[in-house]
């Protein structure tokens, strides 16, 4: 590990890459500790709010560090000896340009080149890997371990898929297993929106009603970062509804923080998109693949890779 850290900090600009579970976030924390112990200043960032929370309480999104707002980026200089960017596979060229323009110290980009690029954007990571120094973490072991973790089941009808999905998630609920359902899309019969309402009726049919169609006990995901409340809530964080609080909804985030947000700042999260799951892992994952409805988009290589690698213990791919 010490030689890997040295390699990552040897150059002004470098990339740390590896597959799911290869230790990228752990290495990022080690780099932060090393630089701080030497008296240096670190700016820890990620491309998503959820990924930033995994780096520590003082981490933030890269967009916030650079002062992104309606008029563009307002920060011209970042006062740090080291800037870390986790989930760098989601970088766009313009954001990278603003980052390099503002930074005076070292920049370490951390990510998985096989993950999804931002919607509608050109993948930046693949090109950077050809020109910047690269530290690679345990990729072969990570890929090999996935072979025994992923089960693929094809269904002759949507009804059969939903019947089996009901059995699986009820089994997880009965045994207290942490799980997450994924779909590539929001719309359609097997999209996130419909599956969430369907799963709400299975997992929490009797929860007391709250604003916006939510129920006490529902699993939800934050859709808008809020730093202006007592305990921050960031886009992509998940939690559980505690009940209504005036015109807001009180929830306990998975981090343990309790916040109150408006209904429009939340979505049900029994099922989330593959894009939203990027940067997170769960004990068990059920990856619903609406192949007939979505065609090539649902089976695109990067989409499949991210969906299949979100489970720490096992992933069940359900294809129709």
Question: Model-predicted segments: where are they?
Answer:
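C-terminal accessory regions
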Residues: 237-320
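Structural beta-sheet core signal
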Residues: 44, 109, 181-183, 287, ...
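Conserved helicase motor core of P-loop NTPases
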Residues: 2-7, 11-12, 114-234, 240-242, ...
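Cofactor-binding loop segments of dinucleotide-utilizing enzymes, especially the Rossmann-like FAD-
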Residues: 47, 112, 139, 184-186, ...
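ASCE P-loop NTPase helicase motor core
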Residues: 5, 9-152, 157
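Residue-level signature of catalytic and energy-coupling elements of molecular machines
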Residues: 86, 112, 185, 217, ...
């Amino acid at each position: 590990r010490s030689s890997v850290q040295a390699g990552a900090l040897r150059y002004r600009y470098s990339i740390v890459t590896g597959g799911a579970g290869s230790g990228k976030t752990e290495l990022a924390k080690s780099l932060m500790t090393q630089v701080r112990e030497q008296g240096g200043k670190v700016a820890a960032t990620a491309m998503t709010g959820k990924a930033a929370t995994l780096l520590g309480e003082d981490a933030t999104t890269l967009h916030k560090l650079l002062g992104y707002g309606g008029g563009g980026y307002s920060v011209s200089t970042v006062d740090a000896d080291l800037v870390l960017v986790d989930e760098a596979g989601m970088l766009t060229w313009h954001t990278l340009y603003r980052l390099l323009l503002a930074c005076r110290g070292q920049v370490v980009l951390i990510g998985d080149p096989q993950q999804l690029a931002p919607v509608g954007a050109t993948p930046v990571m693949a090109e950077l890997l050809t020109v910047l120094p690269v530290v690679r973490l345990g990729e072969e072991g990570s890929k090999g371990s996935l072979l025994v973790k992923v089960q693929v089941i094809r269904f002759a009808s949507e009804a059969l898929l939903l019947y089996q999905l009901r059995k699986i998630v009820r089994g997880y609920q009965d045994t207290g297993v942490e799980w997450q359902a994924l779909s590539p899309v929001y719309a359609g019969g097997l999209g996130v929106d419909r599956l969430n309402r369907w799963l709400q009726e299975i997992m929490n049919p009797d929860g007391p009603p709250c604003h916006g169609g939510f129920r006490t006990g529902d699993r939800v995901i934050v859709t808008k970062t809020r730093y202006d409340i007592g305990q921050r809530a960031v886009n992509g964080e998940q939690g559980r509804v505690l009940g209504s609080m005036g015109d807001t909804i009180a929830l306990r985030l998975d981090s343990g923080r309790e916040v109150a947000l408006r209904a429009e700042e939340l979505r049900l999260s029994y099922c989330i998109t593959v894009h939203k799951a990027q940067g997170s892992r769960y004990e068990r994952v059920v990856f619903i693949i609406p192949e007939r409805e979505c065609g090539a988009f649902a089976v695109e290589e990067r989409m499949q890779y991210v969906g299949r690698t979100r489970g720490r213990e096992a992933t069940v791919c359900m294809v129709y």
